[in-house]
Regions:
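Bacterial Sec-dependent N-terminal signal peptides
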Residues: 1-32, 371
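A non-transmembrane, solvent-exposed segment enriched in polar/low-complexity residues
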Residues: 21-168
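Generic structural signal for well-ordered beta-strand positions
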Residues: 66, 249-252, 351
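N-terminal targeting signals for export/organelle localization
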Residues: 154-233
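N-terminal "domain-start" segment that seeds a small globular fold
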Residues: 219-252, 315, 362-370
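Short active-site neighborhood of thiol/selenol oxidoreductases, capturing the structured segment around
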Residues: 249-278, 291
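Structural microenvironment flanking redox-active thiols in thiol-disulfide oxidoreductases
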Residues: 272-311, 324-329
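Thiol/disulfide oxidoreductase modules built on the thioredoxin-like
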Residues: 313, 323-368
Length: 372
């Protein structure tokens, strides 16, 4: 089974590596964003799945800025222009952070800070390497699946992709275990080790220091492990609500049907391909009792609008434009790389997690054959 992820996996860590703060300690972030002649620059943190503005200023012609905010434990903060998605993420602790960037390449900003920021930069370098390799293999899969492609190579490239995915997960686990005193470790574990519950999650939690596990990220990691344990295949699906135009949608809305819930990200080709393939599965199985409830997490207005127009999704889609997670992501422990879906059976039992649209169709075929 091909687990579709890739470039978004790197973007996701900049969006899903979350933060909160309180107390009397403060930090300052200053620097220059070349080419940023006007507009409001915001310093943000995450709170309850939403970005919260902490400080702001109107950028001058020289592109220089200085912002500050309170901080307790070392945590992730963001810089964003106007209403756009956060463009720069950094790990802040008491002291000073310096940023040197260009408006056209904010993802390559040079950021200097404390030891946690240095560790974050080191880790993200490895993640970009993994993402590049996975994207290249994914393109090979697409070319092989083309009309004039070498179909015999699809299985080979798929196996390569899955092998690389397993290597990445093991790398993340080893990285977290090797840095038991880092506040970054539980954040990385809950962001990347998101394929369902594994005893490896408990191993990491035991290895991390009491101070780290008692922090915001440590507590979030404990909650993530609990949710992962409670959403294993064969268990009853947890209840949740997604609201669109004042109408709440939950598993109860689709009682008696096979429900596939999926979180995805607009503006990413692998996510778009996944949703396009899912649409074909829906059209095949909808009359036989399949319902789909999808939720796009984050993403810009223009990208989302274009994707929704081109995809023309026939089911209920609930956008979470300003968030980094929602009830669906939280309840099923679907943090990290998207898309991610869960199949809930007619009786409310979880039948599958992280399956491709092709595998979803196979599962539905099996259920039809053996339940009739």
């Amino acid at each position: 089974m091909l687990r579709i992820s890739g470039k978004f996996c790197v973007a996701a860590v900049c969006v899903l590596l979350v933060a909160g703060c309180s107390g009397g300690k403060t930090f300052k972030v200053k620097g220059t964003i070349k080419g940023a002649k006007n507009g409001v620059l915001y310093l943000q943190k995450e709170e309850d799945g939403r970005y919260v503005n902490l400080d702001s200023l109107e950028m001058g012609k020289n592109g220089q800025f200085e912002l500050s905010a309170p901080v307790e434990d070392p945590q992730m903060y963001y810089l964003a222009f106007g209403k756009a998605e956060p463009a720069v993420s950094f790990f802040a602790e008491k002291g000073e952070i310096t940023v040197d960037a260009h408006i056209d390449s904010l993802d390559r900003a040079k950021i200097k800070g404390g030891k946690e920021q240095e560790l974050y930069v080191e880790f993200m370098g490895y993640m970009r390497d993994f993402a590049t390799k996975k994207n290249n293999i994914y393109l090979d899969i697409l070319r092989s699946n083309a009309v004039d492609g070498d179909k015999d190579s699809v299985a080979v490239y798929t196996a390569m992709y899955e092998s690389l995915d397993r290597r990445q997960l093991q790398f993340v686990a080893n990285f977290a275990i090797s840095h038991p005193d880092s506040y970054l470790s539980p954040l990385l574990a809950s962001t990347f080790l998101n394929k369902g519950y594994s005893p490896l999650l408990d191993t990491i939690a035991v290895k991390l220091s009491p101070e780290v596990m008692g922090s915001r990220y440590g507590k979030d990691f404990s909650g993530f492990i609990s949710n992962a344990k409670n959403t294993l295949v064969g268990m009853e699906a947890p209840d949740f609500e997604l609201v669109k135009d004042s109408v709440a949608y939950s598993p109860k809305t689709f009682a008696g049907k096979n429900l596939f819930v999926v979180a995805w990200a607009s503006g990413n080709q692998q996510n778009i391909d996944y949703m396009s393939a899912l649409k074909q599965v829906y059209e095949k199985w909808h009359d036989k009792g399949l319902e789909v409830l999808s939720s796009s997490i984050g993403g810009g207005d223009e990208e989302y609008g274009y994707d929704i127009y081109s995809l023309n999704l026939p089911w209920t889609e609930v956008r979470d434009a300003r968030g980094i997670k929602n009830a669906l992501v939280d309840k099923f422990a679907l943090t990290g790389a998207l898309p991610a879906g869960v199949l809930i059976g007619r009786d409310g039992t979880i039948l599958a997690r992280y399956i491709s649209p092709d595998d979803l169709s196979k599962v539905l075929g099996y259920l039809e054959k053996h339940n009739n």
